[in-house]
């Protein structure tokens, strides 16, 4: 239900949140290797997250990406991440392609989609990086977010 870009963005920010105590920057190519994702694609999808102020980037020898100053894993929801990649306002568009689909001018799927999309958006808004990190701590065998073992 989310794009590959959003999936990778969530995994990357989960990784950065787990590393936050080290207070260092991580190169996109190093994260990509650890996360098992294409490096050029990861570098591209991190940029909207920088623009939104969720992460900070720094060029140069000790550069890379990290959570933005003052941002904690509890501050960043999946909605924040996915919206940066996909502009979630588009989810409200009619499933059947009607130019106007509202309670007054509903398509056959309007009520179902309205309820489903509301639940989906609420789930994204109520789930934080901290919760994903907690899952990783409780279930390290899951391999999330890094399918590649740390050497």
Spans of features found by a protein language model:
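A short alpha-helical element within helix-turn-helix/winged-helix DNA-binding domains
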Residues: 26-36
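C-terminal regulatory/oligomerization modules of transcriptional regulators
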Residues: 77, 92-151
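Minor-groove-contacting beta-hairpin "wing" of winged helix-turn-helix DNA-binding domains
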Residues: 61-69
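Key DNA-contact positions within bacterial/archaeal DNA-binding proteins
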Residues: 40
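Alpha-helical residues within the helix-turn-helix
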Residues: 33, 50-51
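Short, hydrophobic-biased segments on the C-terminal half of alpha helices
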Residues: 13, 46-47, 78
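Conserved segment of winged-helix/HTH DNA-binding domains
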Residues: 70-96
């Amino acid at each position: 239900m989310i794009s590959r870009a959003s999936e990778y963005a969530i995994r990357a920010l989960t990784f950065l949140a787990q590393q936050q105590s080290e207070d260092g920057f991580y190169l996109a190519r190093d994260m990509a290797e650890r996360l098992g994702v294409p490096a050029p694609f990861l570098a591209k999808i991190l940029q909207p997250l920088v623009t939104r102020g969720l992460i900070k980037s720094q060029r140069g020898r000790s550069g890379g990406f990290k959570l933005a100053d003052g941002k904690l894993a509890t501050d960043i929801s999946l909605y924040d991440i996915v919206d940066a990649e996909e502009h979630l306002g588009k989810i409200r568009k009619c499933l059947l392609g009607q130019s106007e689909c509202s309670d007054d001018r509903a398509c056959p799927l309007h009520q179902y989609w309205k309820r489903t999309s509301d639940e989906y958006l609420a789930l994204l808004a109520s789930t934080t990086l901290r919760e994903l990190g907690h899952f990783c701590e409780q279930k390290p065998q899951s391999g999330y977010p890094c399918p590649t073992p740390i050497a």
